[in-house]
Amino acid sequence: MAEELKPELWTTSSNSALKLSLVNDENAVQFSPIFTYPIFGQAEQLFGYQDLNILLAFDSVTFKPFLNIKYTKKLERGLDDVEGSILKFLPEGDVILKDEVEWVDAFNGEREKFALPNSESKVAEYTSGGESFAIFKVHLSDPNIRQLHRRMQIFTLLFIEAASYIDEDDSAWDIFMTFNTSTRQCIGYTTTYKHWRYINGQEFDSSEKTTKRAKISQFIIFPPYQSKSHGSHLYSAAIDVWSKEEKISEVTVEDPNEAFDDLRDRCDFMRLSGSGLSSSIPEDVPIPRTWLTEQARKYKLSLVQFTRLVEMILLYDNSPNFEIQVKARLYQKNHEVLTGMDSDTRKAKLQEAFTSLKEDYARILQKVPNRRRVLPSDEENAGESKRHKKE
């Protein structure tokens, strides 16, 4: 009885207790979630058990789910419903509980009928590590895709901050999925949404056609396949598709985290550099806003994102205009604050902001293929290790 009166003995971190697995023909790759608050609450704690171990496993091909919850002791009342909490976020009636043999038989049976999306939906292919991969643009109207997505969407809650399930009945959603073409394993996917874009009244009145904005919502590469360039290929495939769609006027990203910001910056930088943009950047400093706006529309990027990329290109090319361009933009952006300072303080603050941004650009560019040195050697480590807020 005394033991039951000590809450700390019955409280477990849900992040530590939950173990995820993707099972292939050879082994099971186990990893932990980053977040569990969407399932177990903001505190990410579970009460009422000792030595709690939650195994949530998926077949790496069909994503057929398996759940097994173990513990050495539990309270008779007042304990959290661990199983019920998890099952709310998985397809109803689809989860195999505790019986591993039944689960293996079930997903092996499903594998016999499992097929990749049809070839007409393939939008890109590539090789990595001696294996072949393909990216497909698919829709939830396909019952096979809908079932697969229902099973894997719980990963977005566990690895993406503030993620939520999408409305699978909304036809505006498209999904880009990457598959290993030999094993049929899904490597990762991104959910995307297209909606009507209103720019301003003048352009709306003068335009004969409506345009849409494409938005990347959720983007995930499953943990066993990360750090192998699959994310870059997936992002680039979606951008390539939208760049050819006349009705898409801009591509945006919904609440990106820092890692995705970096991936997007590198991919966009490579795309713009490969297009020959560098040779067309005006020598005027600061760069005219009219040119930036026109080119941002051409590449279907927001003005803020495009301006950042142009500045990265100037740094990459060691352009003497880089520092002047960045400082001019930072001064204009922070004009009201800076004008209230004396001259020496203003110069120091502007230099501090410039140095911080330059280091951040350099850190990103250091991971670009075939990169050149863009910072002196004594600054390179600082750029590699620090993450600065974007300006």
UniProtKB/Swiss-Prot annotation:
UniProt-annotated catalytic positions: 254 (proton donor/acceptor)
Interaction with histone H4 N-terminus, annotated site positions: 173
Keyword check for Iron: no
Catalytic activity: L-lysyl-[protein] + acetyl-CoA = N(6)-acetyl-L-lysyl-[protein] + CoA + H(+)
Cellular component per GO, a single term: chromosome, telomeric region
GO MF annotation terms: chromatin binding; histone binding; histone H4 acetyltransferase activity
GO biological process, one term: subtelomeric heterochromatin formation
Family named by the database record: Belongs to the HAT1 family.
Main function: Catalytic component of the histone acetylase B (HAT-B) complex. Acetylates 'Lys-12' of histone H4 which is required for telomeric silencing. Has intrinsic substrate specificity that modifies lysine in recognition sequence GXGKXG. Involved in DNA double-strand break repair.
Name the UniProt record assigns to this protein: Histone acetyltransferase type B catalytic subunit
Biological classification of the source: Eukaryota, Fungi, Dikarya, Ascomycota, Saccharomycotina
Gene: HAT1
